[in-house]
Each structure stands twice: as structure tokens, then as C-alpha cells.
């Protein structure tokens, strides 16, 4: 046949750059020369020669086959299938033809046809390792792990030095949790070719899965040494350093990734996590935003960014981020929880309560999910039905939302409450509740049920309809053996540490560590000689009194508390409670006693934003942290407020300025145990609506107004 001399070349336009005459060569010589061009990447010359062979010998199977293979390399799959299929028709017993046809069909996603081609290849040559390997790849992509592993086993049996088969066998074994066998497969691949970075990387993944961290680090480093731009290996190595707390080392590795590719979303996210942990919130926000712009497909970056935006009080932006996350994954419960926390924080109660129902799918709250035989109450009138209200999450949540028992009570409905054993005697003081059952004991018959924190949604609570009449809880018994009788001083209860062991924590809502304060930070308050402080702590934080040598400043009451009724008995004898955001703060507010609550910058949704009073507890005053981790200003403000109270005239202070409705009734000559329902119902709103009563306690003028009101009401 005639063709160009192999010294000739064509430019990009296909024009000849040589005037030399063509030479006569055989078909086989032309085919060999085409294969050489093909293998060296000179594809244009290879195509030209394959084509000329077919011009001379139209049914030449090898030329058809190789031209089809070359076409498939450039994505011309249909043409490739036609050429290779025609080659098979002309020479059906060539196993490599069937194997390469299978490869093209696989590339097109025609898995079943591809498997048939590979099987036809193996029918001709059962020991063709490449066909077993390719068949395993199809099985693996279809999720048929057992068949894939079997195919890879046959591939390495046919060719023990087939590196790819060893690696893929390791992958399938890892997917089957056969980790030791996977390690052996990867190590065999490395033994054949130590420079295959993928084998080292996969080996590192298995070591990490087995918590063999040092081996994983070594394997990842080996992969990186052989492939310095191996982004996956760098990311995993950075992750290990981050988890181990080597944040500087992790940052260095992540930055190496970004120097290779600046838009790796996972790396940007990981850098955001590091900055977040180090308190560099601005940098963390920047990295999270860049990760989202890079198109990350996971929602955890949105969750973290939403949390930080909420912490910076950029609530509208946080809502947008959470909604964006729901576009990616509408069923991510943590995103719904994050959205709920922001909506509730800014007062969007209707949507916020709806989103909060996703808590039952949240990993942190799954232990609190309950299954009941009877239906979930839908908020419709109860009539004479029996409803089971069950507490969920922490003590504070139960105390706050048990108020709704009074809201749904009527003359016919029977209310049963199931709660933590520590709350039973306390909740039994509510007249609206027929029976209180400790959690874990058998339940009586009931018609419908509802968790306490679903009641605001069911009852359509908004900012203007929060049931905030206090007290709605009272001491279990009128008499107590605990007597705090020191009329010479202002008696102040103190709680400085949140107990994360007893109350559920959800990082999307708030964390106990940020709510707690070192007892030492209160030291300046202990210098007030007019005050006697009593510890209401019941956990290990009580030892702080001894550690900081405050035994002469603080009387430890918590050691004698077994239930919240014990705590209640103490609180009722105190003039004031100062507490971080704990169950004691809720309890004090529910008892209608004065409570000063100390809040971190990122406070829980129930305290809203920029308020110094509580919509839930009229007798509560909020002291807000201005800077994360810095409680100095908060303590200073408490000191100023204490000074004002003392200067108002202790110890007679609470004879003329009182917080409790019970005390108000006593001052105007009405027994708290006997005053009429209309007095309780109408007097509380009267005082709470008093625009001059900004400090949330009754003055002499308030008492005079109350007396005049009661007199007019009774005379009418």
C-alpha cells in the first residue's frame, strides 16, 4: 500500500510539511506503524494509517478494532461500538475485542451489555486478568460487592502482579468491613509497585478506620510523597491533625491543598472549623462562605455558618443560609433545628415551632423520642378526654413548659404528666394536673399525648400570648426543715455552673460550657457585707467552694437537695437568686421569686435578643454577656444592681418592694391560699401591664393600686 514516509508530518490543519514522495509499505507494516503512533500519543497519524488500512482491506478486524478503541478514547463511543462489533463479526474468537467492547459499553453506562462482553471474553480466555478486572469494576459500580470481590480475586489469580486488581479488591473488602483483608490487598499492591500513590492512600483510610492513627499518617504521607498534589490524602492528613488538636499542623496541610486548588470545598470547610475552634469567628465565617461558593454538597458547612451568623446576631443572614441548606437536603434535621433556633430567637414563633418539631429526628435528641400507642394530640378541644403530657430534654425545659397544663385545663379534661422523678413532687403542686408519673413507671389509660415542648405550637403561642402568669409552681409542703432565718442580711441563692450531665445539650441551640462561669469571677460580690450567699449547686461544681476557699462566704445548700422540691423550699426563703441559664433559673421564675439570670453572648432562643427582661418569667432580670468568654462586665452590672437594692433599705427591702404575687396578696390582706380565681386572673395582668413597673417588682405605689383595685372589684 502507499503511505507517507514516517519522516513526514502533518501540521494542525492536516497540510503536508514534506514534499517527499509516498512509499510502498505492506498492510501489516502500516498497522504496526499505526499502533506505534497510537501508543506514543500521536493519534492523528494513527487514525490516518488505520483508515488507509481499511481502505485497502475493508474487513481487516484488527484495524477496525484499534480504530474503534482510539475513537472511544476521544469519546466517540457509538462509532467505537460499531467498529469493534464489526471486528468481532469478522473475527469472533479474539478475546481482547470482546474485552474492549465491554470497556466502551461500560463507559456509556450500558452495564449489562458490558458484563456480557466481558463474559464472552472470558468464555474464550478464562485466564484473561484484564477481563476479570473490568468485570469487577462493573459489578462494583452497580453495588454488587460480592460479585466484584469474586471478579477481582480471579483477576489477581490470573495475574498476581495486577496492581489495579489488588487495589480494587482492597476497596471492596473495605466496603464489606473486612479491614484486615483489605490491608493485605493494598500491601500486596504496594509490594508490586511501591510508587502507586492510590494504594498508600487507601491503606491510610483503612488504618484510620481502625484507629491506627500513626499508621494512617504514615500511609497518607507516603501517598503524598509519591503524588504531592494528592488532594484527598492531604485533606485526610489534615483531618487527623485537626482531630488530634494539632491545629497549626492541620492548617499548614490544608493551606497546601488550597495552594494546589483554591476552591476545594471540604478543605475550606475544615479551615473554617479550625478558626471556629480558635475563636476566630470572622475568619471562620469567611472560610465557610468560600466553601459554599465552591459548591460543597454537604450541609454541615451551612449549619456551622448559620450558627456563627446567629452568634453574631445576623439573624436574617442565618435564616437564608439554613434555607439554602434545605435546598440541598430538605430532610437534614440539624438544619431544621438550626433554623428553628434562629426563628424562635427573632420571635417568628409560628414557623419556629413548626421547624422545632424536627427535633425528634436530630441525633442529639433521638434518646428523648417516645413511641406511644395513643395518638398525638392535634390541638383540638379536649372536652372530657385524658391527655398525657410528657417531659422531654432537660429539667429547665420541663419546668418552663409545664405552665401549659394550666392553659389547657378546664373543668372536664384530665391531665396526666410523666416527668423525671426529681420533678414529681414539684409538679404535683399544680391544681390543673390530676396525676404525675415518674418516667419509667407504668402509665394509666389516656386518650391523647403531647410532649411539653410541642404545646406552644399546638396552642399557637406567639409573642403576645405567652402564658406568663406566675407563680404556677409552689412548694410541695408548707413546712420545711430547712430554715434560712437571717433577717440581718439579704439572702441570695447562687448557681454558677450548668450541669451538662443532667440536661441535654444541642450545639445548635447552646452549649453548657458557654453558660457556666467560674465561681472565682463572683468574688467581688462576696464582699457585700449586707448579703449572705447560698449555693444551690447540686453537681460536682459544689467543690469550687472549697477549691477557692469561699467556705466562709457561701453556705452550701445543694448537698442536702434530693429533688427539686428541696430546691424549691430553699428558694422560697431567699430574697433573690442569681443563676446562669440552668433549671434553677426556670424554677425560681416559675415560683414567682426574683431571679437574675446571666446569659452568654449566644443565649438560648427563649431569652430573645437584646432584652433585659423575660417574656416567660415576669420576675426575671437578664444580665447579658457582651463579649464571648468575658463575664467581667456582667458581674460589674450585678454589683451595681445589688448596691441599688441594698441602698433601697435592707433588711426591710422586700417588705416594700416585692416580687411574688403571693407576697403582694399578703400585703393587701389576702391569703395566697384563699384569694379568688378572679383576683389571681385579673391582678397579675394588671401589674404586668403597668408601664412604670420596668424593674418587675412591686413598689409601695403598686401595693396601693392593688388595694384600691381589690376594694373596687369586691364592692362591685
What kind of region is each of these model predictions?
Residues 1-576, 581-649:
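Alpha-helical solenoid repeat scaffolds of the TPR/TPR-like class and their adjacent stem/linker regions
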Residues 514, 656-657, 695:
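Helix-turn-helix/winged-helix DNA-binding modules
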Residues 651-677, 712:
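Polyanion-binding surface elements
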Residues 641, 700-716:
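A short, Lys/Arg-enriched interface patch at domain edges and termini
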Amino acid at each position: 500500500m502507499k503511505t507517507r514516509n514516517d519522516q513526514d508530518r502533518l501540521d494542525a490543519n492536516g497540510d503536508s510539511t514534506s514534499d517527499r514522495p509516498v512509499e510502498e509499505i505492506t498492510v501489516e507494516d502500516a498497522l504496526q506503524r499505526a499502533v506505534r503512533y497510537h501508543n506514543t500519543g500521536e493519534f492523528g497519524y494513527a487514525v490516518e494509517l488505520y483508515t488507509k488500512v481499511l481502505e485497502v482491506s475493508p474487513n481487516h478486524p484488527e484495524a477496525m478494532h484499534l480504530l474503534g478503541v482510539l475513537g472511544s478514547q476521544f469519546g466517540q463511543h457509538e462509532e467505537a461500538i460499531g467498529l469493534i462489533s464489526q471486528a468481532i463479526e469478522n473475527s469472533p474468537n479474539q478475546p481482547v475485542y470482546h474485552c474492549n467492547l465491554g470497556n466502551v459499553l461500560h463507559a456509556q453506562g450500558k452495564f449489562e451489555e458490558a458484563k456480557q462482553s466481558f463474559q464472552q471474553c472470558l468464555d474464550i480466555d478464562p485466564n484473561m486478568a484484564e477481563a476479570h478486572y473490568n468485570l469487577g469494576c462493573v459489578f462494583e459500580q452497580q453495588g454488587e460487592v460480592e460479585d466484584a470481590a469474586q471478579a477481582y480475586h480471579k483477576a489477581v489469580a490470573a495475574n498476581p502482579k495486577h496492581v489495579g486488581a489488588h487495589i480494587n479488591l482492597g476497596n471492596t473488602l473495605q466496603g464489606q468491613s473486612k479491614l484486615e483483608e483489605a490491608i493485605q490487598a493494598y500491601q500486596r499492591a504496594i509490594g508490586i509497585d511501591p510508587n502507586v500513590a492510590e494504594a498508600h492512600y487507601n491503606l491510610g483510610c483503612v488504618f484510620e478506620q481502625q484507629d491506627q492513627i500513626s499508621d494512617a499518617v504514615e500511609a497518607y504521607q507516603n501517598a503524598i510523597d509519591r503524588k504531592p498534589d494528592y488532594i484527598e490524602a492531604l485533606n485526610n492528613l489534615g483531618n487527623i491533625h485537626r482531630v488530634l488538636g494539632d491545629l497549626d499542623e492541620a492548617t499548614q496541610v490544608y493551606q497546601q491543598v488550597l495552594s494546589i486548588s483554591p476552591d476545594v470545598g471540604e478543605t475550606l470547610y475544615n479551615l473554617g472549623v479550625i478558626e471556629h475552634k480558635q475563636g476566630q469567628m470572622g475568619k471562620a465565617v469567611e472560610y465557610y462562605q468560600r466553601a459554599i461558593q465552591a459548591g460543597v454538597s454537604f450541609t454541615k458547612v451551612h449549619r456551622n455558618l448559620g450558627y456563627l451568623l446567629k452568634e453574631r446576631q445576623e439573624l436574617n443572614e442565618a435564616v437564608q443560609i439554613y434555607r439554602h441548606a434545605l435546598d440541598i437536603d430538605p430532610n437534614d434535621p440539624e438544619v431544621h433545628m438550626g433554623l428553628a433556633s434562629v426563628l424562635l430567637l427573632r420571635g417568628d414563633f409560628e414557623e419556629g415551632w413548626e421547624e422545632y418539631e424536627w427535633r425528634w429526628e436530630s441525633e442529639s435528641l433521638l434518646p428523648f423520642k417516645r413511641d406511644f400507642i395513643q395518638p398525638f394530640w392535634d390541638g383540638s378541644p379536649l372536652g372530657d378526654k385524658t391527655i398525657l403530657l410528657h417531659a422531654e430534654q432537660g429539667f429547665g425545659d420541663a419546668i418552663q413548659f409545664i405552665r401549659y397544663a394550666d392553659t389547657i385545663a378546664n373543668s372536664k379534661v384530665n391531665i396526666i404528666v410523666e416527668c423525671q422523678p426529681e420533678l414529681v413532687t414539684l409538679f404535683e403542686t399544680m391544681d390543673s394536673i390530676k396525676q404525675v408519673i415518674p418516667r419509667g413507671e407504668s402509665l394509666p389509660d389516656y386518650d391523647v399525648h403531647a410532649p411539653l415542648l410541642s404545646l406552644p405550637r399546638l396552642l399557637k403561642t406567639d409573642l403576645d400570648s405567652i402564658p406568663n402568669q406566675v407563680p404556677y409552681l409552689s412548694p410541695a409542703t408548707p413546712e420545711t426543715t430547712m430554715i434560712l432565718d437571717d433577717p440581718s442580711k439579704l439572702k441570695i441563692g447562687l448557681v454558677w455552673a450548668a450541669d451538662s450531665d443532667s440536661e441535654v445539650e444541642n450545639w445548635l441551640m447552646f452549649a453548657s460550657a458557654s453558660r457556666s462561669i467560674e465561681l472565682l469571677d463572683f468574688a467581688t460580690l462576696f464582699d457585700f457585707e449586707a448579703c449572705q450567699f447560698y449555693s444551690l449547686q447540686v453537681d460536682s461544681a459544689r467543690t469550687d467552694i472549697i477549691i477557692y476557699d469561699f467556705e466562709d462566704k457561701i453556705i452550701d445548700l445543694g448537698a442536702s437537695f434530693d429533688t427539686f422540691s428541696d430546691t424549691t423550699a430553699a428558694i422560697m426563703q431567699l430574697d433573690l437568686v442569681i443563676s446562669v441559664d440552668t433549671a434553677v433559673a426556670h424554677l425560681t421564675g416559675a415560683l414567682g421569686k426574683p431571679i437574675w439570670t446571666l446569659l452568654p453572648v449566644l443565649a438560648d432562643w427563649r431569652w430573645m435578643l437584646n432584652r433585659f427582661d423575660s417574656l416567660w418569667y415576669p420576675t426575671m432580670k437578664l444580665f447579658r454577656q457582651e463579649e464571648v468568654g468575658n463575664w467581667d462586665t456582667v458581674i460589674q452590672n450585678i454589683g451595681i444592681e445589688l448596691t441599688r437594692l441594698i441602698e433601697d433599705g435592707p433588711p426591710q427591702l422586700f417588705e416594700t418592694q416585692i416580687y411574688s404575687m403571693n407576697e403582694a396578696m399578703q400585703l393587701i390582706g389576702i391569703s395566697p391560699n384563699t384569694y379568688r380565681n378572679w383576683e389571681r386572673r385579673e391582678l397579675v395582668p394588671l401589674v404586668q401591664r403597668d408601664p412604670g413597673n420596668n424593674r418587675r417588682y412591686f413598689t409601695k405605689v403598686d401595693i396601693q393600686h392593688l388595694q384600691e383595685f381589690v376594694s373596687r372589684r369586691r364592692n362591685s
